[in-house]
Amino acid sequence: MAKLNIADIRQEYTKGGLRESELPGDPLSLFSRWLQEAIDAEVDEPTAVIVGTVSPKGRPSTRTVLLKGLHDGKFIFYTNYESRKGRQLAQNPSISLSFVWHAFERQIHIEGIATKVSPEESDEYFRKRPYKSRIGARISPQSQPIASRMQLIRSFVREAARWIGKEVERPDNWGGYAVTPTRIEFWQGRPNRLHDRFLYTLQPDGEWKISRLAP
């Protein structure tokens, strides 16, 4: 294996700063502003979020999904409940979410608890998905080994034939999670690695405590 010469790859962070005077009391309003700025700037996959879960033995795993909503202070995404993350969340609902927008030199890291959304909410979103995505959700044994890509394609074709002229129904093993945050950190790159980091921590009375963290 060739040696990767990456030790000297670096860049300065000069896109902006984050001041205490700019921080709202509610972190979700700052999250919404940063996300909207990423959307308006047409960055690639602005809603992409790295989801971290933990196995019963404490082994962490991550994957990238798409945020599909922010409702009543909760972050919403959808997945296969029988996937690796679904199985882990069934045993340990603790979860982390990380957003990275390189164009703005910004990151947001969230910790919280995941719960399933209602079947009705999952149905409503599923109906909005493209037809082929709905078929794909029905036939994919997500995270399980399969013999070949051809097997997947054949399953897709057979399933699509079953639903010609009919509304494709959401499978029971597919739906949404709502993440209730307990900690939200905002990271803004700054020159000389003196980055701005602010941590919001949810208090027992429902208020958020704000702390500046060392970079």
Segments from the language model and where they lie:
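Binding-site signature for planar aromatic cofactors or substrates
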Residues: 1-215
